[in-house]
């Protein structure tokens, strides 16, 4: 099965369905609240959607406690990762290794040099202060997956704040991917949202990548 939900290709090849853990879909099916929202939206299906996503951004603003003008909506997190890279056009970027492969793939599209900070088994593959030391004036963009994919490890909030301060000092953007953070019962403890007054911080959240 190809990563990312090609269930039809799997069915055509093997004649049956598989449990696909590479796609963020629920085995419980479509929630009734979502089905209801779809039915209610059908009356406006003859119109183009609002390009500024005003209603959605207002709802997200209330739910997340973030000013509406700080929210940009896209077609999944991957879309926004590419948009950020295309807008910033970094010459050199820093990612952890291992991590979500889409960061490097997006950076490759603008010819960006990708520097990889290796997560060590001796630290249980968790990021350390050494990650901050890897940021210098040559780095334009830093990606941090919180929690990291595929290790599942979290960066301590104090470390994230220190990393952001380092990025600010060096003129780099810190992009924190929190797409899976809400799976944690204490997600609010780990989010970087309290740091959003910084112009150097971008947070990704999504229903799916």
Regions found by a protein language model. Name each.
Residues 49, 61-83:
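Short loop-beta-helix segment that forms the pyridoxal 5′-phosphate
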């Amino acid at each position: 099965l190809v990563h990312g939900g090609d269930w039809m290709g799997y069915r055509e090849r093997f004649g049956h369905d598989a449990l696909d853990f590479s796609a963020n879909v629920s085995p419980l099916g479509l929630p009734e609240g979502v089905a209801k929202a779809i039915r209610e939206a059908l009356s406006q299906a003859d119109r183009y959607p609002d390009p500024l996503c005003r209603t959605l951004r207002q709802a997200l603003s209330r739910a997340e406690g973030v000013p509406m003008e700080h929210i940009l909506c896209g077609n999944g997190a991957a879309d926004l990762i590419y948009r950020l890279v295309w807008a910033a056009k970094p010459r050199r970027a820093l990612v952890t290794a291992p991590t979500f492969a889409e960061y490097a793939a997006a950076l490759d599209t603008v010819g960006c040099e990708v520097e990889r900070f290796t997560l060590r088994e001796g630290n249980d593959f968790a990021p350390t202060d050494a990650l901050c030391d890897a940021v210098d004036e040559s780095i334009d963009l830093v990606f941090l997956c919180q929690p990291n994919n595929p290790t599942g490890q979290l960066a301590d909030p104090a470390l994230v704040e220190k990393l952001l301060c380092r990025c600010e000092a060096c003129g780099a953007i810190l992009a924190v991917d929190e797409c899976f953070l809400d799976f944690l019962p204490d997600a609010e403890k780990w989010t970087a949202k309290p740091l959003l007054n910084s112009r150097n911080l971008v947070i990704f959240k999504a229903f799916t990548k």
